[in-house]
Regions:
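Conserved N-terminal beta1-alpha1 strand-loop-helix module at the mouth
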Residues: 14-99, 119, 179, 207-222
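N-terminal beta-strand motif that seeds the catalytic metal site of vicinal oxygen chelate
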Residues: 21-35, 221-246, 279-286
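Catalytic beta/alpha-barrel core
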Residues: 33-35, 56-63, 80-88, 101-109, ...
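Glycine-enriched alpha-helix->loop->beta-strand junction motifs that scaffold or abut catalytic
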Residues: 50-55, 76-79, 98-104, 119-125, ...
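Catalytic cores of alpha/beta
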Residues: 89-99, 132-140, 177-192
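Glycine-rich phosphate-binding active-site loops on the catalytic face of alpha/beta enzymes
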Residues: 107-113, 146-155, 190-212
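Amphipathic alpha-helical segments
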Residues: 239-253, 296-302
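Vicinal oxygen chelate
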Residues: 269-274, 299-336
């Protein structure tokens, strides 16, 4: 049997570790960019973010407190996915990793820093805002880069233009992103997550307003997931019952019928089913911007899902039912 050389095995392990980390970042969806002048406040900030539903942070090396802050968070919040940002030198890489950082983020493309991280298997997301930097990142074996400064560099429109020639490249835009434009960036499926500091503002940290940080984090998560009622499903035991009910709804409200293989939609908001779908009385479909991401955040709240009900299209999860019924109705997520 032919076995791969050790260097290829080692490289494979590094790539797998990087992919696993980026997959988790993608599920979290938001990477708070934290600037700390006082390392003693680091744990309180991290716990506030976790309380708000974000278990990830990028602590920047813009201050002398960064290394100690990372160390404090890594020790007290082991479930936090912790990165080091604004890393400019290989010495800072060593300091960050020694303190407990799990990934490195740089503002620009520094070949020395990138190659150093790649050689040591340290996940890195380098800043790139043009094709030259992107091609250097690809040559280094990376498939995810930071688009920075996102808004100043042209926003989503520029991001889509950059992504065009690089079909396998993904982005983590940062810079000028806030609660109002977050959804626009995340709607572009080449974006794995967005970085931002709006939920960890300087004044909130200085005033020890950790409840305020938690609230802004929670609001950001809800904006990102964008939950909304899509339709209500009515259970029946036969296609005849389905046809009769759909016809009656059309007679009363004028909602045109849209027939499918197992149900009829009487408008977009009412699904009349010709068989017993999950739910004693029926089901309620909750739309979301990203099913995988929504599952991740809801599972952290203890919500259980029926894995057998998963539906995919082109590799993306489109829908899945919760195990729990509420008021005799099943609930399922649907990606919209």
């Amino acid at each position: 049997m032919v076995t791969a050389p050790e260097e290829y095995k080692d490289k494979s392990k590094k790539v797998k570790a990087m992919n696993e980390l980026l997959n988790k970042i993608s599920k979290i969806g938001i990477v708070p960019v934290v600037v700390l002048e006082d390392a003693n406040k680091a744990v309180s900030v991290a716990k506030a973010l976790q309380k708000g539903g974000i278990d990830c942070a990028e602590v920047t090396f813009r201050t002398a407190a960064a290394e100690e802050a990372i160390q404090n968070i890594a020790r007290e919040c082991p479930d936090m996915l912790l990165g080091a940002g604004t890393v400019l030198t290989t010495a800072q890489v060593d300091a960050a990793v020694r303190a407990g950082a799990q990934f490195i983020v740089t503002p620009g493309y520094n070949p020395d820093v990138v190659n150093y991280c790649v050689s040591k298997g340290i996940p890195i997301v380098p800043g790139c805002m043009d094709t030259n930097a992107i091609e250097m990142a690809l040559a280094a074996g990376l498939d995810t880069v930071k688009f920075f400064p996102a808004e100043q560099a042209g926003g989503v429109k520029m991001l889509k233009a950059l992504a065009g020639p690089y079909v396998n490249l993904h982005f983590m835009p940062t810079g000028g992103i806030n609660k109002d434009n977050l959804a626009e960036y995340l709607a572009f499926k080449k974006v794995v997550a967005c970085g931002g500091s709006w939920m960890v503002k300087k004044d909130l940290i200085e005033n020890d307003d950790y409840d305020g940080i938690a609230q802004l984090a929670q609001e950001a998560v809800m904006r990102m997931l964008d939950f909304r009622v899509v339709h209500v499903g009515i259970n029946n035991s036969s296609r005849e019952e389905e046809d009769g009910q759909a016809k009656r709804i059309e007679e009363i409200f004028g909602f045109a019928q849209d027939k499918h293989s197992a149900s009829t939609f009487a408008s977009a908001g009412i699904e009349v089913c010709g068989k017993r779908f999950p739910g004693t009385h029926g089901h309620i479909a909750i739309g979301t911007s990203d099913c995988e991401r929504a599952m991740y955040h809801l599972q952290k709240k203890g919500v259980l899902f029926d894995e057998e009900t998963k539906k995919y299209k082109n590799g993306r999860l489109l829908s899945i039912y919760l195990k729990e019924e509420i008021g005799g109705f099943a609930f399922h997520l649907v990606e919209k």
